[in-house]
Regions:
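Substrate-binding clefts and catalytic carboxylate motifs of secreted carbohydrate-active enzymes
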Residues: 9-30, 38-45, 50-170
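Extracellular polysaccharide-recognition and catalytic grooves
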Residues: 34
Length: 170
């Protein structure tokens, strides 16, 4: 691989984008990002991994951020490639309290609230080319220390064993 690409992947991304267009001009190129970067303007389509309402922010900030990006780059075909919140079906709460993402308490009702509120923001913006939930199933994630099972990402809409659909699934 090109030396220095980790420090600045943009030249390699531009090279790959040109190569893809050379092979098939009819297919759009796609990228995913979680930050402001010139890389976001290289592919035909860009999607962002954003977790407003889970990692410290408020769910309503999703729409504000999307609108700001859309105003700044109106020609950019943008979408949301990841949004989600953790949940354990064996943790329930009577009140709605934002859990600590890196903690062990991930009540199911927060995940449901999170998806309802974020979907309101996403559904009201038809210019987004994609709106992907992260993710369908809880999955193994080495080194992760959050939720009730270390080594697991609990953002799925269905439990790890595929047996229980969490409330947010519906």
């Amino acid at each position: 691989i090109n030396p220095g690409w980790l420090e600045n992947p943009n030249p390699m991304a531009e090279e790959l984008n040109k190569l893809a267009k050379k092979w098939d001009i009819s297919r759009p190129t796609t990228g995913a990002s979680n930050q402001e970067d010139p890389l976001n303007g290289i592919p035909d389509l860009i999607a962002f991994n954003r977790y407003f309402g889970w990692y410290g922010d408020d769910c309503k900030e999703m729409g504000e951020w999307i609108d700001k990006e859309h105003r700044a780059y109106p020609q950019r075909c943008m979408g949301i490639s990841e949004y989600g919140a953790g949940a354990d079906v064996f943790q329930q709460a009577d009140s709605l309290i934002h859990p600590e993402p890196w903690g062990q308490w991930h009540p199911e009702n927060w995940q449901t609230y999170y998806h309802i509120e974020n979907w309101k923001q996403l559904a009201s913006r038809p210019f987004l080319w994609c709106k992907f939930v992260w993710c369908m199933f809880d999955f193994s994630a080495a080194g992760r220390k959050e939720g009730t099972t270390f080594g697991r990402n609990d953002k799925g809409l269905v439990t790890y064993d595929r047996r229980i659909k969490k409330d947010a699934f519906y």
